[in-house]
C-alpha cells in the first residue's frame, strides 16, 4: 500500500497543476482580448478643415511591383505642413482599405510632417505601428517608401526629398529592408501606371 502522505502530496500536486492550467487558459483569453481591443482603438484624427480638392496619390501594387496613379478628393488645410500630413493620412487610409493592393496595419498612421528648406525636404513622422507591423520584404518596403515620396512630390510643389522617422526618432530600417537613415527622392524612377 502507498503511504498516506505520498497520496496526499500527489493529490495536492495534481490540483495545483490543474489550477495552473486553468490560470494559463485565462491569461491566454485575456491576451487575445487585449490584442483585439488594441487593434480597435486607433485614435481618430480630427477631420481636416479646408476646401476639398483633388490630390494625386500613387498607391503600390504589390502583385505587379509598380505604383498606380489615382486622383482622390480630400479636405486640405491651407498650411503646407498640415496639408502634407493630410496627404500622407489619405495615402495610408488607402492602404488600410479592405481590398488594398498594399495592405498595412489598421493602427498605422502619420503623426506629423515637417517641411524644411522652403518645402524642398519633408520629414514624415509615423507611429510605431506603421513600422512594427509593416510586412517585411524588399519589394513591399521599397514600394511603401516610393509611394510616400512620389505622392508627396506630386502634391507639394518643389519638394525634392522625403525622410521617414518613427515615433520622432530615426530608425535604421522600415521592417528589416528599406533604409530609413537616408532620404528618398520624390523623383524615384519607379514604374507608374
Predicted features by range, described:
Residues 1-193:
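Bimodal "functional hotspot" detector
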Amino acid at each position: 500500500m502507498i503511504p498516506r502522505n505520498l497520496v496526499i502530496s500527489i493529490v495536492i500536486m495534481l490540483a495545483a497543476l490543474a489550477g495552473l492550467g486553468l490560470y494559463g487558459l485565462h491569461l491566454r483569453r485575456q491576451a487575445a482580448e487585449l490584442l483585439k481591443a488594441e487593434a480597435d482603438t486607433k485614435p481618430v484624427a480630427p477631420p481636416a478643415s479646408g476646401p476639398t480638392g483633388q490630390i494625386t496619390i500613387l498607391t503600390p501594387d504589390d502583385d505587379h511591383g509598380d505604383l498606380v496613379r489615382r486622383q482622390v478628393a480630400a479636405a486640405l488645410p491651407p498650411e503646407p505642413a498640415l496639408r502634407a500630413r493630410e496627404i500622407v493620412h489619405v495615402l495610408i487610409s488607402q492602404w488600410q482599405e479592405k481590398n488594398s493592393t498594399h495592405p498595412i496595419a489598421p493602427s498605422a498612421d502619420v503623426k506629423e510632417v515637417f517641411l524644411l528648406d522652403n518645402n524642398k525636404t519633408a520629414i514624415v513622422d509615423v507611429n510605431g505601428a506603421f513600422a512594427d507591423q509593416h510586412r517585411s520584404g524588399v519589394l513591399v518596403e521599397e514600394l511603401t517608401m516610393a509611394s510616400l515620396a512620389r505622392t508627396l512630390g506630386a502634391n507639394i510643389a518643389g519638394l525634392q526629398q522625403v525622410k521617414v522617422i518613427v515615433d520622432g526618432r530615426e530608425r535604421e530600417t522600415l521592417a528589416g529592408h528599406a533604409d530609413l537613415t537616408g532620404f528618398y527622392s520624390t523623383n524615384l524612377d519607379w514604374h507608374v501606371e
